[in-house]
Amino acid sequence: MSDLLTVENLRTSFHTHGGEIRAVDGVDFSIAKGGTLGVVGESGSGKSVTALSIMRLVDLPGRVERDSSITFEGRDLAKLREDEMARIRGNEISMIFQEPMTSLNPVFTVGDQIAESVRLHQAVGKKEADERALEMMRLVGIPSAEKRMRDYPHQMSGGMRQRVMIGMALSCNPKLLIADEPTTALDVTVQAQILELMKDLRDKLGMAILLITHDLGVVAEMVDEVAVMYGGRIVERGPVSEIFANPQHPYTEALLTSIPLLGMRYTTPLKAIRGMVPSPLDWPRGCRFAPRCDYAFDRCTTELPPLFEVGRQESACWLCESGPRAVRQAAAN
């Protein structure tokens, strides 16, 4: 299956009085047509900036550096004029943001906001746009959709607002949907409903999904492949089942071992990842995870490892240079 989106050497920096913040620093990945990719990592790893960079929504003083490449159906989005990008944004590529209450305009009804998106990109009249808005509200499972079209955002629950955001994002039949933490502000029951809705719509509409999240449970539920980000770079990527079963990068392993498991005894301590994510103003010289890694050795602190192929996975760890990472006791032990 051919790739819909190919990102190569994506670098996004924020040029401030305090120095250059390299929030995204050489990211590469691709998404096939109809495929799903999850990008996971702690806060500050560069996940959301990666999504905003693809959409060309990074505000000043940030910028996507010139040697970055974001190829979508043969067009390099990083090189397009703003008017050309505006025809793609919200039309061929749509994005769902983290918090629907702050993403929706409080002074317009939700129906008007969906219809406005349709009119902007589809060049249709008000009647056709309103009909499309009603169709989308029904598609995303909003009950009494015709009545709820006249509601304002504050009159809807968090789950219903997120359904509106999904309906707005899908109103122009995008080929790629970027979902940035789409369930963060929702309770567990509503999270499950939203994830099930997104899976159903993906299968029904045949779109590709780039899912940004810190929740490994969401990743296991939703995606085919996963890319693990740390310190502005991808440190591991591959099929989600293989990464969960046999993580090759110590950071991925640390994320997985910090999750409580069903049936775990309350006396069993969870393993926390020591330390903090380093500042993007001053990334460590070698592997950016080395100061927190239980397996680090001298080379880790002086040389930045590339992604090594490990079967169907790739891992940016010197322990994988010659193949799968050897199972051994952590250096801290």
Label every PLM stretch briefly:
Residues 42, 178-182, 186-268:
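P-loop NTP-binding/switch modules centered on Walker-like glycine-rich loops
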Residues 123, 127-142, 149-150, 245, ...:
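ABC ATPase nucleotide-binding domain helical subdomain, centered on the C-loop/LSGGQ "ABC signature"
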Residues 3, 143-146, 237-333:
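Short catalytic/signature loops enriched in Gly
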Residues 63, 77-94, 112, 120, ...:
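ABC ATPase NBD coupling module
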Residues 4, 13-26, 57-63, 81-84, ...:
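A short, flexible loop at the N-terminus of ABC-type nucleotide-binding domains that lies
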Residues 65-76:
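Conserved ABC transporter NBD signature motif
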Residues 171-175:
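A short, proline-enriched helix->beta-strand linker immediately N-terminal to the Walker B motif
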